[in-house]
């Protein structure tokens, strides 16, 4: 049973102030799962994008403005967003504190297309 440590995972900058760690994916032995830990500094964003698969986003810390399709809402720690395949979504951290999101995909290779 593999035990994976975030300290061993390289940080990927998604956009200024937004970092992602690929905790689980095909490179780490997963066959049909990807899990990413995303950190957003105050004012940072995850640009609007789509995926060919669904995505569950668990808000771990902080408060974010979330876009899902044509809707914009405020989400906080403990809430989960489910984005269906092909539906545009993204986040902006409009708070004065940092925020974290756990992004979960039903595929070993997460694919993302920026849309706006």
What are these regions, as identified by a protein language model?
Residues 1-32, 112-116:
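A short, N-terminal "cap"/entry segment at the start of jelly-roll beta-barrel domains
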Residues 54-64:
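Glycine- and acidic-residue-biased ligand/ion/polar-headgroup-sensing regions
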Residues 24-25, 46-51, 92-94, 113-114:
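Short histidine-centered beta-strand/loop micro-motifs
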Residues 70-85:
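Short acidic-glycine-tyrosine-enriched beta hairpin
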Residues 48, 66-67, 83, 89-95:
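Short beta-strand His + acidic residue motifs that chelate non-heme Fe in jelly-roll/DSBH
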């Amino acid at each position: 049973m593999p035990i994976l440590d975030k300290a061993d995972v390289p940080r990927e900058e998604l956009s200024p102030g937004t970092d992602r760690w690929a905790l689980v994916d095909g490179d780490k032995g997963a066959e049909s799962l990807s899990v990413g830990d995303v950190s957003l500094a105050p004012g940072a964003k995850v640009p609007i994008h789509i995926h060919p698969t669904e995505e569950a986003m668990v808000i771990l810390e902080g408060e974010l403005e979330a876009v899902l399709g044509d809707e914009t809402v405020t989400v906080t720690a403990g809430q989960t967003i489910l984005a269906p395949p092909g539906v545009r979504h993204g986040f902006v951290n409009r708070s004065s504190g940092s925020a974290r999101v756990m992004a979960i995909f039903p595929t070993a290779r997460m694919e993302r297309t920026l849309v706006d």
